[in-house]
């Protein structure tokens, strides 16, 4: 089934050119089913690229999805046209009375700052609190994962000696988790970050399950047993060129970045980056939509205000 989107959204033409089926509201209304309602809080400066990456993966499911985009009014974007935000994004005030089956909170290039120093931190905390009673499952990505852990469990991020940038091997630790269903024992994923969350803090302060981890990346994917909270420190949503674009951006800014590891053929930055995480990305996002959202969310989303039964893995 397709994603229902505003046909004027720039990502629509890109997805159609890749033979991904999307449709507008007029066509969707004729399908007599309740679509899964997904909210994406896009904190990345590359708004259109991130929209396209996430929608590409969400479209890889047999379910009809209805997607809203959210932005923080306390932050003024320097890289995205105001007209784009006004046309395709909603504010927290617009959606605070709505209910959603799933929420995705993206990463953001603010990880070296203390959380409280981020200009939209208070507004983001409102979203975290609201999501407990208005969203069934929240998928936190990279800095979004670190922010969610800090808000919910007071687990702080720790500065790394060097930036972690490249494609890294991770091991599946919980084979029985629905989120890891269909994965090989090990998988590759992009990572791009200066900070990490420590295993001892997760063990001491939370009851989260460690679904995947790696020797170089440390913790990779965490989740609560009922999958209402999912945390991914990598960037499975990244497309082929994203790390290349980040490397060249930092090079141009005079930051002397290291070449992303395990990314270019023979570490030659003039070569076409090798795509090796597409299957893992498609599997993970499909599992989240199917098992964490569709199989568990109540038909009447208003019931999220109450205690929700968890049907379990098997």
Swiss-Prot record:
Q: What is this protein called?
A: Homoserine O-acetyltransferase
What EC class is this? transferase
Query: Which EC number applies?
Result: 2.3.1.31
Q: Where in the cell is it found?
A: Cytoplasm
Q: Site feature Important for substrate specificity: at which residues?
A: 192
Residues marked Important for acyl-CoA specificity (site): 111
Q: Which family does it belong to?
A: Belongs to the MetA family.
Native source organism of the sequence = Streptococcus mutans serotype c (strain ATCC 700610 / UA159)
Gene Ontology annotations of biological process type: L-methionine biosynthetic process from homoserine via O-succinyl-L-homoserine and cystathionine
Q: Which GO terms describe its cellular component?
A: cytoplasm
Taxonomic path? Bacteria, Bacillati, Bacillota, Bacilli, Lactobacillales
Q: Where is the active site?
A: 142 (acyl-thioester intermediate), 235 (proton acceptor), 237
Positions of substrate binding: 163, 192, 249
GO molecular function per UniProt: homoserine O-acetyltransferase activity; homoserine O-succinyltransferase activity
């Amino acid at each position: 089934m397709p994603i229902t989107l505003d046909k004027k959204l720039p990502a629509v033409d890109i997805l159609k050119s890749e033979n991904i089926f999307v449709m507008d509201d007029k066509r969707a209304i004729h399908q007599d089913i309740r679509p899964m309602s997904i909210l994406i809080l896009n904190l990345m400066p590359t708004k259109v690229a991130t929209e396209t990456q996430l929608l590409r993966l969400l479209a890889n499911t047999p379910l009809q999805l209805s997607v809203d985009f959210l932005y923080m009014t306390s932050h003024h974007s320097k890289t995205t046209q105001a007209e784009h935000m006004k046309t395709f994004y909603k504010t927290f005030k617009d959606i605070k009375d709505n209910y959603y089956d799933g929420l995705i909170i993206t990463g953001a290039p603010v990880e070296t700052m203390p959380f409280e120093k981020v200009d939209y931190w208070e507004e983001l905390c409102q979203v975290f609190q609201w999501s407990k009673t208005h969203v069934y499952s929240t998928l936190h990505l990279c800095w979004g994962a670190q922010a969610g852990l800090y808000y919910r469990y007071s687990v702080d991020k720790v500065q790394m000696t060097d930036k972690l940038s490249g494609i890294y091997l991770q091991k599946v630790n919980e084979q029985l988790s629905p989120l890891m269903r269909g994965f090989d024992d090990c998988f590759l994923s992009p990572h791009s970050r200066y900070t990490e969350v420590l295993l001892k803090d997760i063990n001491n302060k939370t009851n989260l399950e460690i679904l995947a981890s790696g020797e170089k990346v440390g913790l990779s994917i965490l989740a609560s047993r009922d999958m209402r909270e999912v945390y991914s420190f990598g960037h499975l949503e990244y497309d082929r060129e994203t790390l290349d674009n980040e490397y060249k951006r930092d090079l141009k800014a005079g930051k002397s970045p290291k070449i992303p590891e395990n990314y270019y053929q023979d570490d030659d930055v003039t070569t076409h980056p090798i795509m090796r995480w597409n299957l893992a990305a498609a599997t993970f996002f499909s599992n989240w939509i199917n098992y964490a959202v569709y199989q568990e969310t109540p038909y009447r989303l208003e019931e999220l205000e109450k205690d929700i039964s968890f049907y379990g893995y098997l």
